[in-house]
């Protein structure tokens, strides 16, 4: 019984805002634990204003502690899982609205919580600037005289209403306020604004939810019904309209207007005249104008000297005989009346005497204190400037002063007169500033700084920075334009040259400026080299006889400058290349195929620099820098795609190749690890692997033919070669003649990760070859050591009799030939592997389950690299890897939208994942049954002891 009384007292005490705030601030004790509100995203001040207080409980159904439980002070219902109502946009109003909607969806037999319903509606109206709502069609508040609505209005006055000495007899008691359609002020009508403003308004401020007018500053002579009627523009409120409809009360002088009449004061001597009083500021602002009443005398003597004061909230005109009260109240009204117009002043004893009266009507004007919120109908008809001034005077929110705002607008307009309204980035001036200052802009420049956006973004997704050639060409064109704009006084054109050659005729000063611009990318030297070759080739074609003497001296200077830079860079690259301990070398027997002796044999492509030097008469690249080609090398073949020949000199820049193979990568212990790092090419099973090292992903040099040698001991040599090749190689797998090529274009991506890769099981000793790096073919033969044990003895029974190579590959044939030699070594293992060959599981199946998934993952990852490196789109990538992907897609997938295609792929991946998991579980289950069966049937104690020692049991 005492517990129930305590709960009831707690509920009644929670009607006060201070008590609700204390529950969030101090916390609540539950089962000898102190629990506090821990959600900083949900402000507890706003929760308390809405009517919630912190009340953590234990859920009786699940017996779990609800740390985010709150309770309503009106309906006393609890709301759980408040944390799930947090806004993803971190919008506080949206979060609070979600909490209130969740509170309203509590399923029980009780009526809906009208307090939370009303405050949610008011908060929504404030958020969307809806003004006065349509209460006519509202489900709960369409009838202001409904019993539940009246009880809600009474509930709002229970929190220390200052005029409730005797509720029934006092003219400002709770009953009078409720009957007038007023509610106690809460900040939900103002969007839960400034707390300091709430304290000033919470004293005796009331408002009507239908017309949203605030009333405060009550005096003992005020009538709540009369003030509400007048503030709402003589009954322009849904509350009075519904009273007339339901109670059949006529809105005339004998009903509500009669109650609004002003009682005479001592100085009037029985006169009951109501006149319209307007100050200078009120005449400028139409908000304070009220609709004319039906009756009232006309003022005859306009110049009559009478002391008139607007001091009472019942809108009566008082005589100057009120003495000190008149002076004191007039001083209080001075600040609000003179807010916009500084010329109007109210001094003590000197009241403004500009009194106007209509001919036959009397206009009653409320004071500034009465109207705290603008009427929507009036504000829509006024000008923007007046609306802004009225909003500043009426709204309780803090707004900057008119003079400050106008001053700031004048400053902004003065500063922005000569600027365009649209945001325009002047890249020309930016490049000039970058050249002079020597610093880069983190946004306009593709910076590679540690904290730059470009570097962080590409590192996060493991995507290389886009450094395609046409991007650099755009930079070059910008630089060229800047230089020509700066150096307008210098003659840069060759008068006698044709228009084709004029773009290469630049002066030496421009080249000096150009050399200071840093190219973005890792291989800027390659771009400079290509630029040098193009310039040299075009300069060599100029008819120098037609060039005047004035323009000829500048061309050699430019030519020599670019040549010096390119020679230095190529010399450094050449020295670095010759200092390598081991480079890619080919044996003559691998380079040629016995299929035919003509040009259809395997060919190693000649470097593109050599081809350019052969075509250009004035090449600036020294001959000693290029690697010397072998004598047997012939002219490379260009790949034929759909009947079109791709030019052999087509080259994609900025693809830096650097991939190293170490001797440890070819060890047998890393065989299982290599299965998860396989090549990203999606093609037919691998035959004799040919690693085609090329810088271009578009023009892949397809080497025809496949070397067919007899299956003898020549395949197994004791040579060991450590092959170090460069990064991002393009691996092209070829198939025998009896197999059909899956990829006809020859352009699937096979770029490896920036790590050392293992190709085969064996180790190779290093040799150095003079094969050109950027276009060479290396064929690697498998080397088997006789003493090599391919799988540890403990797991040999899981892999014997299986092959990790494709069924029709030549490596599979080599594996079969060496199976006899490996069988002798396998017999030397422990007897743990004997007698279990009948039920041994297929270990290669385990290692190959994820092979296809890795291939697809690597393929799309490399495709993304390709797109970023070359800025590939369907418009400019006619025969590249992106176009290859689209050509290989089924017709039904091409007709799908992107979202449907992604959903289809996600579903297929899910199904494949479930199938792979089932396969792995079957393999593990098989292994477990095999091992347990072997241990249970083993009778040799020594073998059991050995197995226990190996497993770490003994």
UniProtKB/Swiss-Prot annotation:
Residues 385-396 have a biased composition (Basic residues). Zn(2+) binds at residues 208, 211, 228, 237. Residues 593-604, 819-835 have a biased composition (Polar residues). Residues 556-583, 809-818 have a biased composition (Basic and acidic residues). The modification Phosphoserine is found at residues 477, 508, 552, 587, 751, 765. Residues 375-419, 541-645, 661-685, 798-839 are annotated as: Disordered. Keywords: Cell cycle, Cell division, Metal-binding, Phosphoprotein, Repeat, Zinc. GO terms for cellular component: chromosome passenger complex; cytoplasm; kinetochore; microtubule; mitochondrion; nucleus; spindle; spindle midzone. GO terms for molecular function: metal ion binding. Pfam families: BIR. BIR repeats lie at residues 20-117, 153-241. One of its GO terms (biological process) is mitotic spindle elongation. PANTHER family: DETERIN (PTHR46771:SF5). Component of the chromosomal passenger complex (CPC), a complex that acts as a key regulator of chromosome segregation and cytokinesis. Component of the CPC complex at least composed of IPL1, BIR1 and SLI15. Interacts with CBF2/NDC10. Interacts with CBF3D/SKP1. This is Chromosomal passenger complex protein BIR1. It comes from Saccharomyces cerevisiae (strain ATCC 204508 / S288c). The lineage of its organism: Eukaryota, Fungi, Dikarya, Ascomycota, Saccharomycotina.
């Amino acid at each position: 019984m005492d517990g129930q009384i305590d709960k009831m007292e707690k509920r009644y005490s929670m009607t006060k805002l201070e008590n609700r705030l204390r529950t969030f601030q101090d916390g609540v004790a539950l089962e000898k634990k102190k629990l506090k509100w821990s959600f900083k995203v949900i402000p507890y001040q706003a929760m308390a204003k809405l009517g919630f207080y912190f009340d953590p409980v234990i859920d009786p159904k699940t017996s779990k502690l609800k740390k985010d439980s709150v309770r309503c002070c009106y309906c006393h219902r609890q709301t759980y899982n408040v944390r799930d109502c947090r806004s993803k946009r971190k919008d506080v109003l949206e979060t609070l609205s979600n909490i209130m909607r969740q509170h309203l969806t509590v399923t029980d037999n009780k009526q809906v919580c009208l307090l939370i319903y009303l405050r949610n509606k008011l908060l929504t109206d404030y958020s969307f600037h809806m003004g006065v709502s349509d209460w006519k069609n509202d489900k709960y508040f369409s009838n202001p005289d409904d019993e539940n609505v009246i009880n809600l209005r009474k509930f709002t006055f229970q929190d220390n209403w200052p005029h409730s000495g005797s509720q029934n007899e006092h003219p400002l008691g709770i009953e009078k306020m409720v009957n007038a359609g007023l509610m106690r002020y809460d900040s939900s009508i103002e969007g839960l604004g400034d707390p300091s403003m709430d304290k000033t308004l919470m004293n005796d401020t009331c408002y009507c939810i239908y017309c949203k007018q605030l009333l405060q500053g009550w005096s003992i002579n005020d009538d709540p019904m009369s003030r509400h009627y007048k503030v709402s523009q003589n009954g322009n409120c849904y509350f009075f309209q519904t009273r007339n409809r339901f109670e059949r009360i006529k809105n005339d002088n004998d009903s509500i207007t009669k109650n609004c009449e002003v009682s005479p004061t001592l100085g009037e001597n029985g006169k009951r005249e109501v006149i319209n009083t307007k100050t200078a500021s009120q005449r400028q602002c139409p908000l304070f104008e009220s609709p004319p009443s039906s009756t009232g005398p006309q003022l005859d003597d306009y110049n009559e000297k009478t002391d008139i004061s607007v001091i009472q909230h019942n809108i009566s005109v008082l005589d100057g005989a009120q003495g000190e009260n008149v002076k004191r109240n007039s001083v209080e009204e001075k600040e609000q009346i003179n807010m916009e117009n500084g010329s109007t002043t109210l001094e003590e004893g000197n009241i403004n005497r500009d009194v106007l009266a209509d001919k036959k009507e009397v206009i009653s004007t409320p004071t500034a204190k009465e109207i705290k919120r603008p009427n929507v109908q009036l504000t829509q008809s006024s000008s923007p400037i007046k609306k802004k001034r009225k909003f500043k005077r009426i709204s309780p929110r803090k707004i900057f002063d008119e003079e400050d705002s106008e001053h700031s607008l004048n400053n902004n307009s003065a500063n922005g007169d000569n600027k365009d309204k649209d945001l325009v980035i002047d890249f020309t001036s930016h490049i000039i500033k970058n050249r002079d200052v020597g610093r880069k802009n983190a946004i306009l420049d593709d910076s590679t700084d540690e904290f730059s956006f470009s570097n962080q973004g590409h590192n996060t997704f493991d995507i290389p920075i886009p450094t395609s050639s046409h991007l650099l060409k755009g930079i070059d064109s910008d630089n060229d334009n800047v230089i020509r704009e700066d150096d307008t006084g210098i003659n840069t054109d060759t008068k006698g040259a044709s228009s084709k050659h004029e773009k290469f005729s630049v002066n030496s000063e421009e080249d000096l400026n150009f050399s200071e611009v840093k190219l973005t990318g890792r291989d800027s030297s390659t771009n400079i080299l290509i630029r040098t070759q193009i310039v040299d080739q075009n300069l060599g074609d100029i008819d120098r006889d037609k060039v005047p003497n004035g323009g000829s001296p500048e061309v050699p200077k430019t030519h020599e400058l670019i040549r010096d830079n390119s020679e230095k860079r190529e010399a450094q690259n050449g020295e670095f290349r010759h200092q390598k301990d081991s480079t890619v070398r080919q044996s003559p027997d691998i380079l040629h195929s016995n299929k035919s002796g003509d040009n259809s044999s395997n060919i190693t492509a000649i470097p593109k620099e050599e081809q350019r030097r052969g075509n250009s008469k004035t090449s600036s690249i020294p001959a000693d820098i290029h690697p010397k080609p072998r004598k047997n090398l012939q002219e490379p073949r260009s790949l034929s795609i759909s009947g079109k020949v791709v030019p052999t000199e087509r080259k994609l820049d900025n693809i830096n190749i650097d991939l190293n193979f170490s001797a440890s990568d070819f060890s047998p212990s890393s065989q299982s690890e290599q299965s998860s790092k396989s090549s990203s090419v999606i093609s037919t099973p691998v035959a004799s692997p040919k690693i085609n090292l090329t810088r271009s992903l578009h023009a892949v040099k397809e080497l025809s033919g496949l070397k067919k040698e007899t299956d003898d001991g020549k395949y197994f040599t004791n040579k060991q070669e450590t092959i170090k090749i460069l990064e991002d190689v393009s691996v092209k797998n070829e198939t025998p003649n009896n197999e059909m090529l899956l990829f006809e274009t020859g352009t699937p991506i096979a770029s490896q990760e920036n790590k050392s890769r293992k190709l085969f099981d064996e180790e190779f000793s290093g040799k150095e070859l003079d094969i050109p790096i950027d276009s060479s073919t290396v064929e690697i033969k498998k080397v088997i050591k006789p003493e090599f044990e391919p799988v540890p003895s403990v797991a040999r029974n899981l892999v014997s009799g299986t092959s990790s190579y494709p069924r029709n590959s030549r490596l599979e044939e080599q594996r079969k030939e060496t199976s006899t030699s490996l069988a002798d070594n396998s017999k030397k293992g422990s007897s743990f592997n004997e007698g279990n060959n009948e039920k041994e599981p297929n270990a290669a199946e385990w290692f190959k389950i994820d092979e296809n998934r890795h291939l697809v993952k690597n393929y799309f990852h490399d495709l993304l690299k390709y797109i970023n490196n070359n800025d590939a789109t369907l418009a400019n990538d006619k025969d590249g890897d992106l176009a290859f992907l689209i050509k290989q897609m089924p017709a039904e997938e091409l007709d799908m939208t992107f979202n449907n295609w992604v959903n289809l792929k996600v579903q297929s991946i899910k199904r494949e994942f479930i199938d792979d998991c089932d396969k792995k579980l079957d393999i593990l289950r098989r292994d477990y049954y095999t091992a347990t069966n072997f241990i249970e049937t083993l009778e040799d104690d020594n073998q059991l002891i050995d197995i226990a020692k190996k497993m770490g049991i003994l």
